[in-house]
Swiss-Prot record:
Name the UniProt record assigns to this protein: Subtilisin BPN'
pH dependence of function: Optimum pH is 9.0.
Segments forming domain Inhibitor I9: 39-105
Gene this protein is translated from: apr
Subunit comment: Monomer.
């Protein structure tokens, strides 16, 4: 590869990017009792700071209220009151306010449809979430400051961008979230939320990188004992060196997954890109939420399996979230599924993991367009 510049491009098409608002604080009133009592917070005026806690409690009790808790640092108390007590307390000269004891909710965590579509929650409910499995996201880096991601390590092979934990493109961060966004009550949930993410930067801010950078990234993954490699990238040109790298990774026991490509159809010709085209790599095509092949998804005899890749919600740099389209979004579903399987069967070889994924798919149609079908990680992990 010396002296030969071969650039490889990202395999995703951005049809939609939007920031998601997850949940909101509710002002819903706690359900009232049959006698009309509801929960309130009664606050006292600053001029009453010398009044004893006992006397403040009496102020509420004398109006028919039932004090639940008197706060230590806030001059107020929670109480159960009926409408009459509320009116009388609002008139009391010692009372500053009487407000509803509103109900707040944890910010909602969304489970992207793709996670459910491949049956990952069934493994989660059994306690298998990817623990002790290392996944290398060979991509544009990962924004390690994102609250929905926990990045265990990484390296950069891009000479001009030496920080793997800074994603100047957004692609790698989005891919990482699909693999392993945390189960932390915010944002989104990844396929394998407890997997260990490693940011291996091989693509620059413009979404491209030389094959030599990718090969360096694969070698780093081998040397650092990664269990799974995800490459949501590809190019139209084959390379003996790139093939040797992925073959070596598989020979070393790594499950290697790559996007099939976003080249759609071209008559009866294969449009699957490299490295997905190599036999040692699991090439992943994209379907939508109805299991229909995405029009952009590459086709060919090298296509192995399908996974969700249309309007996939995931993490973005800057503590954001958004939806992307592409086989780049499908591939990390399979990488995450491999991590789930390995968390349940830590002694399985990469060959067993791949076979289990391919032999338990939901058949969707002609293998030229759909490979072996949609992965079902619940069945694959049996």
């Amino acid at each position: 590869m010396r002296g030969k510049k071969v650039w490889i491009s990202l395999l995703f098409a951005l049809a939609l990017i939007f920031t998601m608002a997850f949940g909101s604080t509710s002002s819903a009133q706690a359900a009232g009792k049959s006698n009309g009592e509801k929960k309130y917070i009664v606050g006292f005026k600053q001029t009453m700071s010398t009044m004893s806690a006992a006397k403040k409690k009496d102020v509420i009790s004398e109006k028919g209220g039932k004090v639940q808790k008197q706060f230590k640092y806030v001059d107020a108390a929670s109480a159960t009151l009926n409408e009459k007590a509320v009116k009388e307390l609002k008139k009391d000269p010692s009372v500053a306010y009487v407000e509803e004891d509103h109900v707040a909710h944890a910010y909602a965590q969304s489970v992207p449809y793709g996670v459910s579509q491949i049956k990952a929650p069934a493994l989660h409910s059994q306690g298998y979430t990817g623990s002790n499995v290392k996944v290398a996201v060979i991509d544009s880096g990962i924004d390690s400051s994102h609250p929905d991601l926990k990045v265990a390590g990484g390296a950069s092979m891009v000479p001009s961008e030496t920080n793997p934990f800074q994603d100047n493109n957004s692609h790698g961060t989005h891919v990482a979230g699909t693999v392993a966004a945390l189960n932390n009550s915010i944002g989104v949930l990844g396929v394998a939320p407890s997997a260990s993410l490693y940011a291996v930067k091989v693509l620059g801010a413009d979404g491209s990188g030389q094959y030599s950078w990718i090969i360096n990234g694969i070698e780093w993954a081998i040397a650092n004992n990664m269990d799974v490699i995800n490459m949501s990238l590809g190019g139209p040109s084959g390379s003996a060196a790139l093939k040797a790298a992925v073959d070596k990774a598989v020979a070393s026991g790594v499950v290697v997954v790559a996007a099939a490509g976003n080249e759609g159809t071209s008559g009866s010709s294969s449009t699957v890109g490299y490295p997905g085209k190599y036999p040692s790599v699991i090439a992943v095509g994209a379907v939508d939420s109805s299991n229909q092949r995405a029009s952009f998804s590459s086709v060919g005899p090298e296509l192995d399996v399908m996974a969700p890749g249309v309007s996939i919600q995931s993490t973005l740099p800057g503590n954001k979230y958004g939806a992307y389209n592409g086989t780049s979004m499908a591939s990390p579903h399979v990488a995450g599924a491999a991590a789930l399987i390995l968390s349940k069967h830590p002694n399985w070889t990469n060959t067993q993991v791949r076979s289990s994924l391919e032999n338990t798919t939901t058949k969707l149609g002609d293998s030229f367009y759909y490979g072996k079908g949609l992965i079902n990680v619940q069945a694959a992990a049996q």
